[in-house]
Amino acid sequence: MDLTDRRNPFNNLVFPPPPPPPSTTFTSPIFPRTSSSGTNFPILAIAVIGILATAFLLVSYYIFVIKCCLNWHQIDIFRRRRRSSDQNPLMIYSPHEVNRGLDESAIRAIPVFKFKKRDVVAGEEDQSKNSQECSVCLNEFQEDEKLRIIPNCCHVFHIDCIDIWLQGNANCPLCRTSVSCEASFTLDLISAPSSPRENSPHSRNRNLEPGLVLGGDDDFVVIELGASNGNNRESVRNIDFLTEQERVTSNEVSTGNSPKSVSPLPIKFGNRGMYKKERKFHKVTSMGDECIDTRGKDGHFGEIQPIRRSISMDSSVDRQLYLAVQEEISRRNRQIPVAGDGEDSSSSGGGNSRVMKRCFFSFGSSRTSKSSSILPVYLEP
């Protein structure tokens, strides 16, 4: 041994290396340590799933909101339309479904008269001008022209003009008064009693008064129209006319076997005889003539004025009824008494008066014809 070894005996001793320092990470014995790539995968999957779920919820919410808004808008529009329809129900219907005019039978029931010009009184120039022209076509009335008068307001129009107007409107085109065929004139120029002639007080007193209607039996009516007095002048100041009021009474007419052609019917006026011949129909709905005779102061009849009247020709049944009534009239005419003397009837007015005897028959209500028909009869002095 060397002296050095002897001096330091610990130099030959070999010391082991120090152990490494302990790591800071703690590993659980239950869950073993995994790699970093395996840890990042669940985080990305959760993030993607969350984003997709959020987008789906947003899209669903927007779709729901849009549908609700559209439904609310449609409901609002429907409510507005319903309110407007409740306030004005005519707006939702077409004109074909809502008929605001009068029926053909109601239009034909409006009285017709013959226009007569008169002298204009001072201070009534404007009223006379308005009463001598039609407010629908703005044409002046001609002498002896047939016109139609509205019973409610006494305004006068051409027959064709007012008929077309009343098909779409139920009021007067001049004053907008509602038209009703049941209305009567203010002064009651025409009043037909329903009682028989023998029970009527006018038949007992044969002195006829102007503006009265003498009713015999239910087959005919005699109308006496005289000159208007001072009280009547205010109502009829616009026109001087002969008023015809259609008054239909329901009587059964025996049809029987009628000929196919209309035979001429004699019309008696005193000692003279006239014959009514067949006339060609200018219109499909026109058939039948009537006459009005003028009675002078001496009680004799003067000029004969024919008047055209219309009946319904909608079906062949009306034609057969017409022929049957013509035959019935010719049979009954021999038994109808004369309705008064000329001398007695001319004593009331002091002036010219007009007498007309007409026969009113009602064909009754049928499915093919809605309006009643008026047929002519003989005129007797």
Curated annotation (Swiss-Prot):
Annotated GO biological process: protein ubiquitination
Biological or metabolic pathway of the protein: Protein modification; protein ubiquitination
Gene3D superfamilies from the UniProt entry: Zinc/RING finger domain, C3HC4 (zinc finger)
Transmembrane intervals: 46-66
Topology term for the membrane: Single-pass membrane protein
InterPro entries per the UniProt record, alphabetical: ATL1/ATL16-like, Znf_RING, Znf_RING/FYVE/PHD
Catalytic activity from the UniProt record: S-ubiquitinyl-[E2 ubiquitin-conjugating enzyme]-L-cysteine + [acceptor protein]-L-lysine = [E2 ubiquitin-conjugating enzyme]-L-cysteine + N(6)-ubiquitinyl-[acceptor protein]-L-lysine
Main localization of the protein described in the UniProt heading: membrane
Entry keywords, A to Z: Membrane, Metal-binding, Transferase, Transmembrane, Transmembrane helix, Ubl conjugation pathway, Zinc, Zinc-finger
Single GO term (MF): transferase activity
Biased composition (Polar residues): 250-261
Sequence segments annotated as region (Disordered): 1-31, 249-269, 334-354
Record's subcellular location: Membrane
Recorded GO CC terms: membrane
Start-end of RING-type zinc fingers: 134-176
Secreted found in the keyword field: no
Key word Transferase present: yes
The EC number(s) this enzyme carries: 2.3.2.27
Written domain comment of the UniProt record: The RING-type zinc finger domain mediates binding to an E2 ubiquitin-conjugating enzyme.
Family: Belongs to the RING-type zinc finger family. ATL subfamily.
Record protein name field: RING-H2 finger protein ATL1
Organism: Arabidopsis thaliana (Mouse-ear cress)
